[in-house]
Amino acid sequence: MKILIKSRKDIERMSQTQFEKHTALISITDSGCEFVTLKYKPDYLLQLDFDDVDNDIFLDEPGHIPTVEERKVLECKYHMLSDEQALQIASFYYDTKDVISTLICQCEHGQSRSAAVAAAIMEFRSRRGISVFAHDDYYPNKVVFRKVLEALKDCIPVCDSNSRNLQNETKNR
């Protein structure tokens, strides 16, 4: 599977023609903003909105490690990637991984949130996520990376014997 990292402008330009068959797109926008305008849509599409806020929001007092409750309050206040959204990304990956040849991860500038999602998937698939962190064009959001990677590890694919549809269950943490 080819994994691409793109910006809003890149995707809007790409969508002026048909996407290649077997393409999936994880499209991320800022909270409260419109989703990317697609003239043509890929075979599989997941659209999410959350802001590009990283770990530094938790470092307001030197030596203070925020509690789980404090983290949740900050995550909500700053519209960060939620655990539920991370599970949506993991489920989307599991639901499409065997039927796609290209996965595109897109955010506003194609540098932080989309890079983090791509890095988490690459790390999960082949332990090559570090290549995104090492690339000069990207600055992966560490919160997004961590949450998506955890969701990928926690999300267990289960085949429903009646419908043969892929469903996901989460392990107890």
PLM regions: where:
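Glycine-rich, flexible N-terminal cofactor/catalytic loop recognition
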Residues: M1-D54
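Short catalytic/ligand-binding loop motif for oxyanion handling, primarily in non-cytosolic enzymes
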Residues: E34-V36, D56, Q111-A116
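Helix-loop module immediately N-terminal to the HCX5R catalytic loop
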Residues: L46, F50-L103
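Conserved aromatic-histidine-acidic binding/catalytic patches
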Residues: K77, L81, C105, H109, ...
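Recognition helices and adjacent regulatory flanks at domain boundaries
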Residues: L87-K97, E108-Q111, F133-D136
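Catalytic cysteine-centered active loop of the rhodanese-like fold, especially the PTP/DSP P-loop
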Residues: K97-R125
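Cysteine-dependent PTP/DSP-like catalytic domain, specifically the C-terminal lobe
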Residues: A119, E123-R173
